[in-house]
Amino acid sequence: MISSSPATGILDRLGKASSAEEFFSLLGVEYDPKIVNVARLHILKRMGQYLAQEKFAGAAEPEIRTRCKAMLERAYGDFVASSPIDERVFKVLKDAVSDSKKAAAFVPLSELK
């Protein structure tokens, strides 16, 4: 577990976290282990997408922590209400949808040897 040194900011501590559970612990977010076990990477990826939209420059540490907590709660909520397949945060899942929209290749029986 990462120490809670006041000199280390929450973003640094999150960057060093080694598990999804550690993110939840650092930010004090309650979670259902069954949901995290199924969607841990998806939740963290979605949180990363939310973090990428944020501007933290000049923000005080308590505000940064509060905003990070809200983003993790929002990302977690996305997967409480939906599934990783429905949310499609990873490229491989997005591509699976676009590939299925392509016309299926047709091979007539007469072409088979």
Curated annotation (Swiss-Prot):
Domain of life (superkingdom): Bacteria
Pfam family, one: NifW
A single GO BP: nitrogen fixation
Keywords from the named record: Nitrogen fixation
Family of the protein in this entry: Belongs to the NifW family.
Leader sequence segment: none
Transmembrane portions of the chain: none
Species, as recorded: Bradyrhizobium diazoefficiens (strain JCM 10833 / BCRC 13528 / IAM 13628 / NBRC 14792 / USDA 110)
Assembly: Homotrimer; associates with NifD.
Listed name of the protein: Nitrogenase-stabilizing/protective protein NifW
Function: May protect the nitrogenase Fe-Mo protein from oxidative damage.
